């Protein structure tokens, strides 16, 4: 029986490289399509991941969801004060860090999304300052007949300031631009 999730030869090549190169990487996603599929697929196919997640407000729901996710989603890192430290440690150990990056953050860095100013969570760019590593986006595109296409982006190069340091705002704008491109391409997702 064919899989309900398809991917291109290039996505498979990028994924295999990330899994087999022995280096850490940061993988970002947004709330498009079925955004939990990439974490499930990555772990199922051998990618060592630490995944940032936000706990539900209900403790009972949190316990049930965490039990399910822990079996299938690798190392789970709850959002909070300690999350950046834990994610940085995961990168230093050579793990891949995955996170959703498209939610408004009141004390975030200013980025432009569809011509409007908004605030992005700077954690991804700050982690790059600790451990320079490749950054890729991943998305799931809903297809007809309950099928999906997984796509891994080419590497998103961090923006650097005049001194060669990772530019937090510029890097988050580059990531936001990728997400804007995804929405423009498939606005119904």
Spans of model-derived segments:
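General structural signal for secondary-structure boundaries
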Residues: 1-2, 80
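A short, well-structured juxtamembrane/interface segment
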Residues: 2-25, 33
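Short acidic/polar alpha-helix capping motifs at helix-coil junctions
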Residues: 2-5, 29-30, 50-51, 89-91
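Catalytic core of membrane glycerolipid acyltransferases/transacylases, capturing the structured
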Residues: 21-80, 106-111, 117, 142
């Amino acid at each position: 029986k064919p899989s309900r999730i398809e991917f291109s030869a290039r996505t498979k090549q990028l994924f295999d490289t990330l899994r087999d190169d022995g280096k850490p990487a940061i993988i970002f996603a947004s709330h498009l399509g079925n955004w939990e599929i990439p974490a499930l697929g990555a772990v199922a196919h051998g990618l060592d991941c630490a995944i940032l997640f936000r706990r539900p407000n209900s403790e009972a729901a949190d316990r049930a969801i965490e039990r399910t996710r822990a079996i299938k989603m690798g190392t789970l890192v709850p959002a909070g004060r300690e999350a950046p430290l834990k994610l940085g440690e995961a990168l230093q150990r050579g793990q891949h860090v995955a996170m959703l990056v498209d939610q408004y953050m009141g004390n975030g860095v200013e980025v432009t999304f569809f011509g409007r100013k908004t605030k992005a969570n700077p954690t991804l760019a700050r982690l790059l300052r600790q451990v320079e590593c490749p950054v890729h986006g991943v998305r799931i595109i809903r297809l007809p007949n309950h099928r999906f296409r997984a796509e891994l982006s080419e590497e998103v190069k961090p923006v650097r300031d005049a001194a060669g340091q990772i530019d937090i705002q510029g890097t988050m704008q580059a990531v936001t631009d990728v997400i804007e491109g995804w929405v423009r391409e498939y606005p119904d997702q």
